[in-house]
Amino acid sequence: PHATFDVGRVAYRLNCYDSLLRWLDNPPKLEPWLAESYTVSEDGKRYTFKLREGVKFHDGTELTAEDVVYSMERILAVKKGAYPLFATLVDPGSTRAVGKYAVEFNLKAASAIFAATTHDVYVVNSALVKRNERNGDWGQEWIARNDAGSGSYIIRRFDPARGFLASRFDDHFLGPANLAEIDFRYVAEVNSRVLGLIRGDFQGTDPYMPQDQIARLQGDANLNVMEAESTRLFYACIHNQRAPMNDVNFRKALCYSFDYDGWINDILGKSVVRNTHVIPNPMWGAPKDVAGYTYDIDKAKAHIAQMASPPREIVIAGMIGYEQSMQAAALLQNGLTRAGVPSRLLNEPWPVVSNKMRDPEQMYDVLFLWRSTYYADPHNWAGELLHTNRHRGGNASYYSNPEVDRLLNEALANADQEKRAPLYEQVARISSEEAGGIYIHNTKWFGPYRKNVSGVRFCPIGDGQEMRWLSIA
């Protein structure tokens, strides 16, 4: 559970492991989960969580504060998954158990978002993992194929290339889930997912498919396509530190070469709303006065003319299995061809993409993807995508601006939303003016399920993939 962080692979974390607090419903609310309550010290640097008593791991042993401490230490040690969320806030060795059912986090600095991020402190059975450690690997090889959680379901089979199978854990602290078994399968082809749902091979599938496929599903009498407003930003990540993208003129040329109206109105059938900056429009802290960029090849050419030399061929990446990502890459290539910029497309699967994003040498020139909601706060977008300390983490554009860092640090240290909001608004304005990325639209969630499925609880954090609430008639 500490090896990955993306929403594409959140299902096994949500269903097989538990966290201190959990985001539920839409608009998302942060609810007690393993922790019944928490307190914050006056200086905002010490968080103390009181745990539920009697919570069981899948092997029947009790979950205690020592397991929470071990889980945080493990996140910091393996440096994967949610590590970027905590690396700048929590020092190794600073988290401690205060008795059997309380845990204390001692932060390096006050943080307005720490409680919100504890949704991603998935707690593992420390005794079980320790027994399976090899050469100081924190049990990474073992846990990749085995279960060490307390969640609503017990992993029975896990294969990154195929998906996972899990069975109900009857002793979960909230009681047993409704479904006896859940089976998440990796199916790369959109058409195969659609046909499988129509035939009844699956009970639910991908909520972010191309609009023509959503319409196809909406026309089937045996299916129900749920709709909900979300906070999931679709954008193009531009490598800001590699030539020619390190020239603001070329980044602006890229922004002017994308056909926003054609994308939103024609390809997506007006199912989404334009988002001109880094923070989704529905989120507080999103400015209302950022006009953004339009599709204007003449302006793109004018900015290219201001460059010291003509741009080289650039690589535009999309993600295999995510049709919109690949379509958007092709649309930008079309605009760049009109602007006289050579480019080539490279579509790769998400595990390959996510590894390359963490390495500035391997990162693509331009990559189309989504920034999902990991915690309901503007820092989830502005801070994670733009702060210099998120290089090799969420900031795969390797954007860096000292003024933006200063504004983000000030916002993070202040618990007052009214004071934080204008700081994030200014960050969004600056990154738009500097063309830090190509910001395109906020996404709507379309959840396709068979009509015999009920109890779906959509939350933007996790995209409605928590299965304990579902029933099948």
Stretches with model-predicted labels:
Residues 160, 305-372, 396, 417, ...:
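Ligand/substrate-recognition segments at binding pockets and active sites
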Residues 39, 50, 85-132:
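Surface-exposed binding/hinge segments that line
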Residues 447-473:
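Long beta-strand-rich cores associated with HINT superfamily self-processing modules
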Residues 24-26, 121-177, 181, 298:
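Gly/Pro-rich hinge or "lid" segments in bacterial periplasmic/extracellular proteins
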Residues 338, 342-355, 383-450, 473:
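Extracytoplasmic/peripheral linker and loop segments enriched in polar/acidic and small residues
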Residues 141, 169-215, 334, 342:
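Ligand-site clamp/hinge motif
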Residues 1-42, 73, 148-150:
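N-terminal lobe/hinge region of extracytoplasmic solute-binding protein
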Residues 165-168, 245-334, 338-339, 400, ...:
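Append "and occasionally in soluble cytosolic enzymes with long acidic Gly/Pro-rich linkers
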